[in-house]
UniProtKB/Swiss-Prot annotation:
The chain crosses the membrane at residues 62-82. This is Uncharacterized protein YGL149W. Keywords: Membrane, Signal, Transmembrane, Transmembrane helix. One of its GO terms (cellular component) is membrane. It is found in: Membrane. Its main location: membrane. It is a single-pass membrane protein. The lineage of its organism: Eukaryota, Fungi, Dikarya, Ascomycota, Saccharomycotina. Residues 1-18 form the signal peptide.
Amino acid sequence: MSINALLYVLSLALLIWTGSVVTLLLLLFFCLFLLFFSLHFFCFTREHVHYTLPPKCHSLKFQFDSIPSSSLSLSPFPFLFFPRLRAVAFASPTLSFFFPI
C-alpha cells in the first residue's frame, strides 16, 4: 500500500470520527438546551410566576404589565405578547440571551 493511499484512508477515518464526535456534541447540547428551556419556560405557570420570580423582579413584572400592546412591534417570539412571560424572560439570563426583549 502506498503512502498516498494510507494517508487518504487515515484522513478519511479522522474526518468520519471528527464528524461523529461533533454531531454527538451538538446533539447533546441541543438536548440539554431543550431540557433547560422547557424547565425554565414551563415551570413558570400563571399561578406561580409571582412567587417564583426574585423579589427585585416583582416591580419589573408590573412594569411590563403596564406596557400597552400597541407599543409592541410584531415579533416571532410569543412572550412579547404576554406580560407574564416577558417578566420571566427578563428575569432569566438564559432566556434573555437567546430571546432578547
